[in-house]
Curated annotation (Swiss-Prot):
Subcellular location, principal: membrane
Protein name from the UniProt record: Probable 4-amino-4-deoxy-L-arabinose-phosphoundecaprenol flippase subunit ArnE
GO biological process, any: lipid A biosynthetic process
UniProt similarity note: Belongs to the ArnE family.
Residue intervals of the EamA domain: 40-109
Length: 111
């Protein structure tokens, strides 16, 4: 159960970061203030919820195991950036993502 909470905390944290990125996207000048307020507001809500869930995780999982699991954020952000904004990702970057996933699997199997 706690691993699901950790994954949810990671996804909420990433969603908050993606909302911040979306807030920086260009929009018509007459819609800019509303656009920024919306996306930054959503980002703050997601990051706040992620922090609450993270505190729940830290109550039961050793920080030396839990913290590296947040490397999942790099994986989620890479996937989202390629899908949402069509950002290019190099082969080297994908190799890094694969290493992160491998590290998470190794650490996760030790608990």
């Amino acid at each position: 159960m706690i691993w699901l909470v950790l994954i949810l905390a990671s996804l909420l944290s990433v969603t908050g970061q993606l909302c911040q990125k979306q807030a920086t996207r260009p929009v018509a000048i007459n819609k800019r203030r509303k656009h920024i307020a919306l996306w930054l507001g959503l980002g703050l809500v997601c990051l706040g919820l992620a922090m609450v869930l993270w505190l729940l995780v830290l109550q039961t999982v050793p920080v030396g195991i839990a913290y590296p699991m947040l490397s999942l954020n790099f994986v989620w952000v890479t996937l989202a950036a390629t899908k949402l904004w069509h950002e290019p990702v190099s082969f080297r970057h994908w190799c890094g993502v694969a290493f992160i996933i491998g590290g998470i699997v190794i650490l996760g199997s030790t608990v």
